[in-house]
Amino acid sequence: MNPLKKKEKGVGISGGKDSLTLLYTLKEILGENRKIEIMGITIDEGIKGYRDESIKNARELCDSLGIKHYIYTFKEHAKEMDEIMKNTRSDPCSYCGVFRRWILNKACKELEIDVLAIGHNLDDTVQTLQMNIMRNEPLRIARFRPSGGIVENEDFIPRIRPLFNIPEREIVAYALYKGINFYNSECPYAGQALRNPIRIFINNMEKDYPGIKFRMLKSYLSMLDTIKIPEKMKIEKCEICKENSSNKTCKRCQFLKELRNS
């Protein structure tokens, strides 16, 4: 990497409390550094009455901070969630997560972004950990790191999660204190997702056993060094979209094929 080249830092922003707090804080910390430019990237999943509203909050903060804001859509690069959910009873987060990650990586490459910051908080982290354990997906546990990943490749833009150990309620308190105008409604498909009962379970455990979320996080971090990663993970180019994939066809293109045939 050219040390004289200006560094581009992307922040994935939905318009919610976590991503806008992250954007605000990074701007406070890095805003005077002329060698670093911060950009906001929003993914519009095509959920009417939800994402179209939260985008307004994302745009408002970017404008007030003087940050460039880019919007990428499922309609352009995948299929809108409202259309998907008309024809399937599957976990909506499965489709949404795959499409969003694919689009974010593509957006970062197009915008020449060096690092992408994501607003996952402590609650998100332990919920994701528990989901991956229940699905018996150790490699997903290994991939979901505070920074970086398990494979270094120039086509995979590194991600960082600066809020990974901060409880959701503290982020809400900070956002309110700073006067950050965030969108506070829940995704209309959240109740159909596996994450929802896991979130309820962990929150109930936290009430009965205060501090359990932090203990889960500590356990998760210790797992990272014990999960066996294949020495040479083969990275291929998807035969359809030509993006990086661990298989001949990436998950995004597999999903699109399934949806077309359903």
Annotated model-derived regions:
Residues 224-234, 240-245:
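Short, flexible, mixed-charge glycine/proline-rich loop motifs
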Residues 123-207, 262:
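Catalytic subdomain that performs nucleotidyl-dependent activation
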Residues 201-220:
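An accessory alpha-helical subdomain
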Residues 1-146, 165-178, 250:
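ATP-dependent adenylation/nucleotidyltransferase module used to activate substrates
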Residues 69, 244-246, 257:
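Cys/His-rich microdomains that often coordinate metals
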Residues 252-262:
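Short Cys/His-rich micro-motifs in 6-15 aa windows
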Residues 237-241, 250-253:
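Short cysteine-rich clusters marking metal-coordination/redox-active sites
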Residues 188-192, 217-222, 233-237:
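Small/polar glycine-rich anion-binding or flexible loop at a beta-alpha turn
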